[in-house]
Amino acid sequence: MREITESQLRYISGAGGAPATSANAAGAAAIVGALAGIPGGPLGVVVGAVSAGLTTAIGSTVGSGSASSSAGGGS
């Protein structure tokens, strides 16, 4: 097993022609998380993929303002 190089990560995450979208970022993070979880066995792979994918997906949907202020309920 060897480390993923920067060029391989760019290829996985869409730099090779796919658009740089939130879905591609979450997918790339899930792949990296799965690879990072390999030492933990099958459960480590699943937990690594799910946690990395969800963290990236949630992080890409967080806006700069709160929901209440954007809906007019903020002060």
Swiss-Prot record:
Membrane topology of the entry: Single-pass membrane protein
Origin superkingdom: Bacteria
Biological-process GO terms, alphabetical: defense response to bacterium; killing of cells of another organism
Claim: Transmembrane is one of the keywords in the record: yes
Pro-peptide region(s): 1-15
Cell location: Secreted; Host cell membrane
Regions crossing the membrane: 30-50
Leader sequence segment: none
One term under GO cellular component: extracellular region
Keyword set, alphabetical order: Antibiotic, Antimicrobial, Bacteriocin, Host cell membrane, Host membrane, Membrane, Secreted, Transmembrane, Transmembrane helix
Function summary: Bactericidal antibiotic. Active on bacteria phylogenetically related to the producing strain.
Name by which UniProt lists this protein: Microcin H47
Natural source organism: Escherichia coli O6:H1 (strain CFT073 / ATCC 700928 / UPEC)
